[in-house]
Amino acid sequence: MDEKELIERAGGPVTRGRLVRDLEALGVGAGDTVMVHTRMSAIGYVVGGPQTVIDAVRDAVGADGTLMAYCGWNDAPPYDLAEWPPAWREAARAEWPAYDPLLSEADRGNGRVPEALRHQPGAVRSRHPDASFVAVGPAAHPLMDDHPWDDPHGPDSPLARLAGAGGRVLLLGAPLDTLTLLHHAEARAEAPGKRFVAYEQPVTVGGRRVWRRFRDVDTSRGVPYGRVVPEGVVPFTVIAQDMLAAGIGRTGRVAAAPVHLFEAADVVRFGVEWIESRMGGAAGGA
């Protein structure tokens, strides 16, 4: 889509001031801690790109507010590295650079904003190579510090801290299936057959690059949703739609983008109850 189409879709160029007004009308306010998921093209033609989006959200939350996003690691070793032919695997492992919170690029699949956010002055990125988050603002260190190596979406994760601190989640043109906070609900929920994964990634420990083994709920297929979600449908979309139907969250528009604003604690509570009520309740494992 070219610039003219994007401008026409939003009824004009999307400026920082326009974004701030729309965010404030939605209910984003001073002192908020907000995790944002963004699809830039849905907003329209944003004058200044991701930096303008970041500036606008920070304007809306003010000096006492904090902006958070999910990064991941764009160049992380693939989960199937152990299945590579031995010669290939060992050659890669011998020189694969360790994850560096300051240098390692955010996963491009998460959009442009996380990568831009991690470059902001004062940005704090969590230490987990596979599930890193980034935050800017007074709550950045409390949210990011000492991200647990194992169960990085579970208790004491940045997601758990977000919910515990009264944080919010903003889907700014991003689809409902990007609601990463629901992985925390998956980690907490007791569900028979819940699957876990173990994998290795290079990190720096004591000044040395080491391959560390991690354990986490399988964020691709950790909960056996197939019994209750039709094939081809993203489970998070169904959960989020049910959540909205239950009156949880606010819906509006920011420029051309459809937006949703959720209280993080409400998302976690609803997600856990949704999973447990449909999966049978008793804890399972793998």
UniProtKB/Swiss-Prot annotation:
One of its GO terms (biological process) is response to antibiotic. Pfam families: Antibiotic_NAT. It comes from the Bacteria. Keywords: Acyltransferase, Antibiotic resistance, Transferase. InterPro entries: Amioglycoside_AcTrfase, Antibiotic_NAT-like. It catalyses: a 2-deoxystreptamine antibiotic + acetyl-CoA = an N(3)-acetyl-2-deoxystreptamine antibiotic + CoA + H(+). Coiled coil: none annotated. Its EC number is 2.3.1.81. GO terms for molecular function: aminoglycoside 3-N-acetyltransferase activity. Belongs to the antibiotic N-acetyltransferase family. Resistance to neomycin. This is Aminoglycoside N(3)-acetyltransferase VIII. It comes from Streptomyces fradiae.
